[in-house]
């Protein structure tokens, strides 16, 4: 990281972190730039990867898909579905349960992730409330 009179820069190639099936390049947060309300990084979901069901407690999240196709199952019981591709923006409200699937078995999903929480990881909790589905409902996920 470099600093100059109020502007802080995180250089590409600096630290990485894996969490819940997703690879994150270090971005900006409270821990490295002193942000007080925001954090941002780049996330990669490997081919066929899943970020298992979780909830962002008390913060919102925005995604911009750079590469790939992604499916979110969300809401109570994870019964709602939305699919997105490169060029799409996605907003996830605070407290919305969701699970994320890379729809490709050969290509990664790469997205810019921005959060209204400077602490990044501390306010994310697992979600256990998936509604059981019928086989026909899960065939597109390879279950």
Regions found by a protein language model. Give the residues of each.
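Short beta-strand His + acidic residue motifs that chelate non-heme Fe in jelly-roll/DSBH
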Residues: 52-54, 72-73, 81, 92, ...
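Residue-level recognition of conserved beta-strand positions in structured domain cores
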Residues: 42, 55, 74-76, 102, ...
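Conserved short histidine dyad/triad with adjacent acidic residue
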Residues: 26, 41-57
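A short beta-strand-loop-beta hairpin characteristic of the jelly-roll/cupin
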Residues: 50, 59-86
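Short strand-connecting beta-turns/loops that link adjacent beta-strands
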Residues: 32-33, 58, 77, 105-107
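Ligand-binding loop in jelly-roll beta-barrel domains
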Residues: 85-86, 94-121
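Hydrophobic beta-strand core residues of beta-sandwich domains
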Residues: 32, 45, 84, 90-92
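A short, N-terminal "cap"/entry segment at the start of jelly-roll beta-barrel domains
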Residues: 1-37, 52, 126-143
């Amino acid at each position: 990281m470099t600093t100059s009179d109020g502007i802080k820069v995180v250089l590409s190639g600096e630290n990485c972190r894996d969490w819940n099936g997703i690879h994150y390049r270090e971005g900006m947060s409270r821990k490295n730039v002193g942000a007080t309300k925001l954090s941002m990084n780049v996330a990669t979901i490997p081919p066929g990867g899943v970020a298992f069901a979780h909830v962002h407690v008390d913060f919102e999240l925005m995604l911009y898909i750079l590469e790939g196709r992604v499916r979110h199952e969300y809401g109570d019981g994870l019964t709602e579905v939305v699919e997105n591709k490169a060029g799409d923006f996605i907003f996830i409200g605070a407290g919305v349960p969701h699970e994320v699937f890379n729809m490709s078995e050969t290509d990664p999903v790469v997205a810019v992730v921005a959060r209204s929480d400077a602490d990044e990881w501390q306010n994310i909790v697992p979600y256990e409330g998936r509604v059981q589905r019928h086989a026909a409902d899960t065939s597109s996920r390879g279950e």
